Every structure is written in structure tokens, then in C-alpha cells.
Amino acid sequence: MQAYFDQLDRVRYEGPQSTNPLAFRHYNPDELVLGKRMEDHLRFAACYWHTFCWNGADMFGVGAFNRPWQQPGEALELAKRKADVAFEFLHKLNVPFYCFHDVDVSPEGASLKEYKNNFAQMVDVLAAKQEQSGVKLLWGTANCFTNPRYGAGAATNPDPEVFSWAATQVVTAMNATHKLGGENYVLWGGREGYETLLNTDLRQEREQIGRFMQMVVEHKHKMGFQGTLLIEPKPQEPTKHQYDYDVATVYGFLKQFGLEKEIKVNIEANHATLAGHSFHHEIATAIALGIFGSVDANRGDAQLGWDTDQFPISVEENALVMYEILKAGGFTTGGLNFDAKVRRQSTDKYDLFYGHIGAMDTMALSLKIAARMVEDGELDKRVAKRYAGWNGELGQQILKGQLSLGELAQYAEQHNLAPVHQSGHQELLENLVNRYLFDK
């Protein structure tokens, strides 16, 4: 079959001085960073949905891309053509992983039977492509938000039959992910929220989605899936309010239903923006709570109130993100999936490469800067010094529960405590970070 990207052999590392737009300047897969290959640190993935499924349509205009596999035709044959192009792209981009929703790779069909038959055929196609290319599945998921049946949600739907249909999709997608060797399974509640409280029973819906997640965990263990289950937080869009608002909200939900040891989070940068947080905040919070799993690397626009899903280009932002990840020991089953799309005006098929190459270079340079920060250890030393009192006798007695509130008040009076505020040195630390970012 003729190559779709016929003007490109493969994207390769050419170094920081290169002006070739189809080459990496900073991402060198085999370069050692803190004793580990860069590819193994970053675990890059390209997503099926934005890259191969979106046709360029938006709220105000029809599709603009004219991809060959998006033309009228027999649905399964078009899905196979899309898979051909997808794996050509993945190979030429030199990414080790990809991610998909069920209906990204397979026609949904008109019934559950058609859905399952179509998906089964496409799983066989994908398995053959993976074997041929060496590309692996980072994670799979089920799209339980696009079809009109999910207008009022999937697991939170007022109709238990819709809940059951969603369960069928999730079981099928989990089984497919397992068969394809996927390292994670993601649950994003696209419409698990509400438009108005006037017709919403919050307690009922919370109980429903809690039970749904418990069943997902039960099925994971029953099928022997060794990967990680991930919830992807998002505060709103398409609903007014979504129940997986941010990392902290998800943790509270997991604790309520006894799932905090079973499910981690897949954090998207743009979703952090929509929640009023920095990407750094969400990563650090997940690590602090012990539920960090994987990352959807992209960026939003702070001046817009919706998910723009642009490619990450800020080394300043992502160096701090990679710093947190490195300090926590790096990815295990997770990775950096580019949940990002070219702009509607970017109609050249090679724009797909330009977007991903820039993003991969951004994250690679961020990794190298973060590694310098870890090796230098200056930030850690200053934070440790700031909290040093908690390693002393008084601090340890408080943390170990050896003093009651009343005893602590008595201690303060007996010792005539008169603590004086110590500077947080924020400006000094910001200058220190800039040294790592901009000094050669």
C-alpha cells in the first residue's frame, strides 16, 4: 500500500543546531538522563482521536482536513485504512506508544452486537500492526459520552439501561486493552456531571458512579489485567460541572468508595487550566496523595474557557512538572500522551508531525532541565531547611500523636513560645529556577 506520508522516511535526532522542521533538536531516545534512556523516562504516546479521527470541524464550521479515511465508504474498510496511516505515522514519528477510545479505532455500529463484532475485528488488525511495528498500547478507553444515549451521562445516567450499555462498552474496551498488552486503562467521565441541579439527585448519581468504578475494579482483577486503572479529572465541558473536577476531588471520591489503592489519575494539562490550577499543582498533588499515574501532555489557553488541546511548547511550565515526576521516581506504567490536535487552519498533513515534534522536543528539554535540578538538589535542600523544625523533638511529638491539643497549648505557655516568621524566599527560588532554565 502506498505511504500516506510519502515525503518522509523517519523523524530522527539531529541536535540543537538543526533547522530541519522534520527532525528532533532535543529528543534523543537513547541519550542517558540520570542513568536512564530518554525514551524510557518520557514514554511518549500519540493519541488516535485528535490525530486520526478529528476532521477539523468545530462549533462554527464543517470538517476542513479531507483525510482519505474520512470519506464516504464501508466503515470497517475505512477503519482499516485509518489504522494503516496511524501506524505509519507512529513509526515515522518514532513514538513507542499510542492510545485510543474504542470508537476511534472501530465503527460503533447500530447495535451492541455490531459494536462488539466490529471492535473484535479491529483489535486483530491493531494486534498485527503492533507486532509489525513494535509500537505498544499505553492505554485504551471507552467513549461513553459522544453517542446521544449518553446525553445525561453514562454511569450517572438516570436510566439503568444506559448504565448497562456503558458497562458493556467498558468491559469490551478493557478486554481489548488487555489483549493488546495495554499498560493502563483510562476512565474519563465526559458527561458524568450535571447541566442543572433542578433535575439532578447528587447523592444518587455519586452512588451510581461509585458502584460503577467498584465493578470496573472487580472486572480488572477477574480478567487478570495487570495494568493500572486511571481516572482523568476535568472540571467541566461538556457538562456545566463534572464530578471528577480535579485531582483532590477524585481522591476524595476514591476514599469514599474504598478505591484509593486501586485507581490512580491521568492528569491533563488543559484540564488543570480549566480547574483554575497550574499543571504543576495537579501533578504535585497527585504525587503527594499517592495516586499519580500518567499524563496527557498538552496546553490550554488561560484566556479561553474551553479545552483547546494545543501541543505543549512551554519548557518553563513543563520543567517543573518533570522535576516533580523525576523526584517521585518517574513513570511506572504511565507516560506522556499527546492529547493535542493541530489547529483547524493547519491543513497540511505534515502539520501533524510539526505539532508532535515540537511537543516531544519541549518535553525532552524539560526533562534535561529537571534532571539538572534534581542533581543539584538546591531546591530540595531549601525546602528541607524550611520544614526542619518538624524533624525536631516538638515536631515529631505532634506528628506522632504524643501531644493533645490541650497539652500542646500548655507546652507553648510553659516554654514562653514567641516564634518569629522566617522568609519563604519565593523570589530567590524563582531566580534559581530561571538559572536552570536559561543558563547554559
UniProtKB/Swiss-Prot annotation:
* Needed cofactors: Mg(2+)
| Cofactor binding note of this UniProt entry | Binds 2 magnesium ions per subunit.
Show the GO MF annotations.
magnesium ion binding; xylose isomerase activity
Chain sites annotated for binding Mg(2+) 2: E268, H271, D307, D309
What's the main place this protein lives? cytoplasm
Chain residues that bind Mg(2+) 1: E232, E268, D296, D339
Q: Which GO terms describe its biological process?
A: D-xylose metabolic process
UniProtKB keywords: Carbohydrate metabolism, Cytoplasm, Isomerase, Magnesium, Metal-binding, Xylose metabolism
* Residue ranges of the TM segments: none
Identify the enzyme class. Answer: isomerase
Q: Which residues form the active site?
A: H101, D104
* SUPFAM superfamilies reported for this sequence: Xylose isomerase-like
Where is the protein found, in the record's own terms? Answer: Cytoplasm
Please give an example of a GO cellular component term from this record: cytoplasm
Q: Catalyzes what?
A: alpha-D-xylose = alpha-D-xylulofuranose
Database matches in Gene3D superfamilies: Divalent-metal-dependent TIM barrel enzymes
Domain of life of the source: Bacteria
- Supply the PROSITE patterns for this chain: XYLOSE_ISOMERASE
Q: EC number(s) per UniProt?
A: 5.3.1.5
Indicate the quaternary assembly: Homotetramer.
Q: Which family does it belong to?
A: Belongs to the xylose isomerase family.
Q: What is the protein's given name? A: Xylose isomerase
